[in-house]
Amino acid sequence: MPDTRPGLTFDESGVCAACINSEEQKTTNWNERFNQLKSICDKYRGSNGNGYDCAIAVSGGKDSHFQTYIMKEVMKMNPILLSVGNIDWTETGRKNLENLSDTFSCEIIQLQPNWHVTRILTRKAFEDRGQPSWYPDSLIYAFPYRMAMQLGVKLLVYGEDVNYTYGGKYNKETPSAMLQPSNDVVQPYSKKWLEDNEITEKDLYSTISPSVEECKKFGLEPIYLSYFVPWNSVHNYEVAKRWGFRHLDHEYKREGSIDNYDQIDSLSYLLNPYLKYLKFAHSIATDNASRWIRYGLKTREEMIPIVEEIDKRLDQGIVDKFCEFVQMSPREFWKIMDKWYNREFFEQDRDGVWHPKFKVGLGLIK
């Protein structure tokens, strides 16, 4: 991973935490970890009588299929799936979520965000933080915890510990997802968003995760499945395909990504990861390429020219869907985008076009 990623640390040899952690996992006793997962499932299986044994936070994507496969088919648990709806759904994403329920015979409780509030907060977070998906991301973090407790379900299953996989605030491997809501992926809302009275604190209630104290008092045990089984996004995709998951190419060939199966539920949502390119000089293609290199599927030399070409692209469909939803003109959109270009990595010509001052794999070019 590049050294511009926030929170990422490096050792004295210049190796990033994500690569160090990946190497450490090659010596992990996965049989022992798998048996630990079995013990946890044995503890909760049947704990609610004929009710739900566990809750799984899902989107309908490849990892959601893998999680549900492990918990339902392998562990023989009776899960309830908890999901948050999108601003706009791709048809592929919608069908994949339906497939998750149909193929694994699971019920899904989905929180459909308040569209009026979503439109307002999407615009505010875009203008103020360059994080247009702040509102749905906050719901994704908070909703499963609250809903699991409301249902009386004590085992909550998440997929990947992103802080450990990619490096971040909590760069220590742990089975517990108790601290996930405070891992800095989603920051608290800004008080100034309330100043014009378009929204109130009541509108933001669903974005607030229960405290650690609340979770412990209830007896909630949130876990990362990636602690107990090897986590590989390509392998997860191959497993998901065997259970009916479909990639996006049947519907849409997008720009700016080197795969067709990751984050395919919504187009407008992808503006958020693209903004990483403006701020930190890398985006989705870098993330995926780094994983493929760590998995041993590709070499760094193979991926550098691909990332150089792909990472900078913003799919027009993303812009169209986003502007349509927030009721913003393309001119207004690009004026806000200009605000988020990092002048350390980009320079703007007299016509307003931005040009990178760096080369992938080399850094800044003087």
Where are these regions (language model features)?
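Short, glycine-rich nucleotide/cofactor-binding loops
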Residues: 54-63
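Hydrophobic positions on the alpha1 helix immediately C-terminal to the Walker A/P-loop
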Residues: 66-67
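Nucleotide-activated chemistry modules centered on ATP-dependent adenylation/adenylyltransferase
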Residues: 1-54, 70-366
